[in-house]
Amino acid sequence: MVSEKIKAGVIGVGHLGQHHAKHYHLRNDVTLAGVYDTDSNRAKEIARQYNTKFFDTPQDLMEICDGISIVTPTESHYSIAKIAIEDFNCHVFIEKPITETTVQADDLIKSAKAKNKLIQVGHIERLNPALTVLEQYNLNPKFIEIQRLAPYTVRGTDVPVVLDLMIHDIDILLSLVKSDVKSIHASGVSIITDSVDIANARIRFKDGTVSSITSSRVAKDKVRKIKLFQENLYATIDLLLEQTEIYTITEDPSLIPDVLKTEPFTQNNESKHIAYQKPNLKKYDMLGLEIKNFIASIRGKEKPIVNGIEARNALDVVIKINNMI
């Protein structure tokens, strides 16, 4: 249990890493001990902005920290996290994906366990209020359709769309379905880049659940939607607009809270209703909540929202999909 302020550092202060630095800086239970970036001018700029130090090496920063955010290209995640955990006894928050390979992920998980350190992974969509509202429902989905489409941008195109975009939805899928994967079928094509730009995966689980996931980075408009079907319930989740709509089949709609409208129908000579809900969702800064969770986990008050094992399992499925295309 840590009682004084947590000393946190950020390795990689580019587009996303700068926001890690900001959130540590804003917390009154954290000292932003410093930042490091391969671009020293960028590190100096962010350090100046958040009244902290910049360091010439990651190791110099790790030496004074309790926890480290690793917000660097994926190929460096393993080496940086390994040093932070084993040589400097740091807890680590790694932006997704956890590592390049499952072998690397397994080794990090083993090291963290031996050193009694946390691995938290930044699968930020898990905190989307349109998704977390489903925790109020008894979910047992049988079919899940997920779409994540985005207009083309240069950022992120150095890796296939499966590793860049689809990994978000694989992590969500594995959190919704409490069963092991039975089979995967996948296809994809290159449109603009030399790697896969559009991909579709059909995943079947051992409990019979089926999912179809499509990811594209050459779409006209942004789309991030989930459709979830189970016995007597259908939900549509818009992660982009942060809206959720739920349709429930019930004999007594008065038992369902906050119903906006109902539609009666007859099934097998029984009177039933389709009850429609559109929960009023509270919006919040999801990265800020991830950082809050990381600090609370270091203190032993919470558990990481996405731990190393969960992130490793998502990576495993993503790699299998990518290898199949």
Which ranges hold each PLM region?
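N-terminal Rossmann-like dinucleotide-binding module
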Residues: 1-50, 173
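Contiguous beta-strand/loop segments that form the cofactor/metal-binding neighborhood of enzyme cores
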Residues: 170-247, 280-281, 286-300
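C-terminal helix-rich "cap/oligomerization" subdomain common to oxidoreductases
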Residues: 1-2, 67-70, 289-325
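Mid-domain beta-loop-alpha active-site segment that forms a flexible
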Residues: 122-129, 152-181, 196-197, 311
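Hydrophobic residues in well-ordered beta-strands that form the structural core
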Residues: 56, 93-94, 119-121, 237
